[in-house]
Amino acid sequence: MMKRLIFSGLLFLSLSFLALNFFNTNENVSESQDEIKLDKATYAAEYYKYRMASRADANGRVPMDGLLRAKEHIARMPQSRDAGLWEWDWIGPSNIGGRIRAILPDPNNASKLWIGSVSGGIWKSTNSGTTWTPVNDFMTNLAITSMVFDPATTSIMYAATGEGFGNSDGLPGAGILKSTDSGLTWNQLESTNNANFTYVNRLAAHPDPDSAGIIYAVTNANRVYKTIDGGVTWVNKFTTASNAVDIRVDQNNPNEIIVGCKSKVYLSTDYGETWSNETSGVANKLPSDGGRCEVTFCPSNSNRIYVSMNRNLGEIWRSNDNGVTWQLRNTGTNYFGGAPGQGWYDNTIWVNPAYSTQIVVGGVDLWRSTDGGTTLTKISRWQDYHNGGAANSAHADQHFIIEAADYNSTTNPKVYFGNDGGIQKANNVWTVSNNSGWTNLAGTSLGISQFFGGAAANDGSIIVGGLQDNDKVRYKSSGSWSGPNNWYQATTGDGGYAAINYNNTSILYGEYVYLKIKKSTNSGDSYSNSYSGLSDAGNSLLALFIAPFSMDPNNPAYLVAGGSKIWRTTNNASNWTQIRGAIGSFINGNGDIEFYKCSTIDIDKGNSAVIWVGYTNGNVAKTSNTGIDWTRVDANDGGLPNRYVTDIAINPNNSNEVFVTFGGYNNDDVWYTPDAGVNWENRSGTVPNDLPVLQVNTVRYHPANSNWIYIGTDLGVFASQDRGVNWSVVTNFNGNEGPVNTEVAELFWQGNEFLIAATHGRGMYRTAAPPAVIYVNSTAPIGGNGSQASPFKTVYEASQVAGPGATISIESGTYTETQIVTFLNEGYIIVTNGSVVIQ
């Protein structure tokens, strides 16, 4: 009797949240370059709204202790290697960056540089940014917003977590991290493991090297904190009237501290003991009706202070008398982008340490002034940053500016810039222009890309995906794997889901925001609009910011897309036809009629007429006749959760079996039906093998083994080999295994062999070992190679081709092998009654 043994590799991630924020907007977005940034204020806000919507409860909140409790649960889970091996390969991109809010040059070594990514952790360069290495991937949180050295030594470092620049609570960070070994290892300061430190937006260190351990922190809890013992304890020195986002200590007079908030600026002249409100709105003071305020002292003039205020699309204010009076230096330049502006999101200001009249301010692009802000000259143009910065400019959306450690205004005016595209450098900040003088430092080995989704050709020759503010990217090879640096960025803006024509890999599909489907006929070199007839496209009231579409696994000319309605094309997206109407609407916070939107789609592999869809309000429906009739299945058998549907997976081998996942911090995020939705079972696991309470983003069947299920969450990938009755997380056998502590946005297969995890912060990972189909026949001669034509004779022979920890499943039938097979001291298999289990 012939039997098939299936070997598979999978690593389980141990991940942490990207700090998120909730914003509400409903304006349309155009995909033309000039209009993208005019509407960037809208879609930057929509990005946070989209990310928050699936995670928040009915009150728009995520539990502040949700991350901690989920991690504690994972620590208690049994450790095993269910449903596969443990190894992954990082496949990039390493030449396309992601959002950076922290840059830290080493004052003792100008070649040494650290950056903090908002979802990719801390990275280090020892050659001025030419190459980068991730630091301590498995620390508590990778949402880095600020970094400083201890005043006394650069061997002690502090990193803030939690990106809190929005209007209301998002997902929590993990307080403040500290390293005492020059950044090699990082640990959470226990004193910051509480709700007051869930968003730590900025750190500042006392400038005196004799003041060891004195650090300041500002948070979204409206607090200004100070520690004098290196973070063992913190004292709230002041409670602000709004979220505190920036803090600076005067390098010449450390008793003077300035704090920028959302709409407020506060100044202290006594080390933070007392504070004055500089935004009182009275004569000679700052206005009281502004937005986010970024602040800076002038090292060459202790009486001079600058503020970049999110007001009137960008205002620069200056004080020449240490805050006694203030003067408006510039307004109307519109450096925060089109109305209403996005200074709440990207806002930064830097002053030349040598000359207090020379400044650079950043919003969407960068502007330079040599007269104290009265005149601004644009020095970067986001449209000229393309394909990893090859066109020589800075990426859009500026978050941080800092001079090089060996900066000299005359002989070495080198300055670094952190933005949504990573980090760029101007060797001469006083001569750099829109498209001249820029060096992209995120173009070789900085892997912090934020994917929403992706797809792979069956042979792996093309892998595509959509990124936050770095749009549609593509890996392409003509043969063997050519490395994570071989990615190409076709366009700019925000990307989303992706698909590849499996019969003709020159035909690719991607999207711009709000369901604007794009098509490439040249393997991703360029894209064109492909949403004719799709009337939901481009309207935030009708489609999600990142809206779902799916290619038919039976015919690549067929695709299905979802907005308020469901749409289908049968001619390679040349035009679209509605196959389901809207299911309902509501009045949103702006008073507009907004429709419930499709959030996920799956199509049966064996029958194109069978389509399942899920919605933001928990509605789940199916059709068996390509949309002529639809049946709601979420109310059957007691009903599914009334929450955002994050994903649907139809068993490719049996269309009656379907998994549906839901967003939020709940213990019922994974559901299974064995009979096409007639009955439902909560498959979040059985104690002690149950899943933690956390966000589930994606679910996939193994193509060759329907018992094996994989989910991607905000805390990693979990696997089950019994259809979700029990779940496992892999143990740490040999150091840090697998992808790092960042969110898995989507799981997808490369053919039937490799599982790929698209992460929102560290690019893509792919399982190192493909599932191999091995044949065993007890009547075969010894010496087979495991192929169908030349099978192995025994399970023992077959096991020799599998790696350590492999799981072997034998198809139905009886097998008489009883020999115990050792797997490199990491477990063994026992064959009993035709089944094989890991012990």
Locations of regions flagged by a protein language model:
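Right-handed parallel beta-helix/beta-solenoid
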Residues: 183, 272, 770-797, 801, ...
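Bacterial Sec-dependent N-terminal signal peptides
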Residues: 1-32
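Bulky hydrophobic/aromatic "packing anchor" residues in well-ordered structure
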Residues: 91, 472, 776, 829-830
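Beta-solenoid repeat scaffold
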Residues: 807, 816-839
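Structural motif
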Residues: 309, 811-812
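Beta-propeller blade termini and top-face loops
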Residues: 25-770
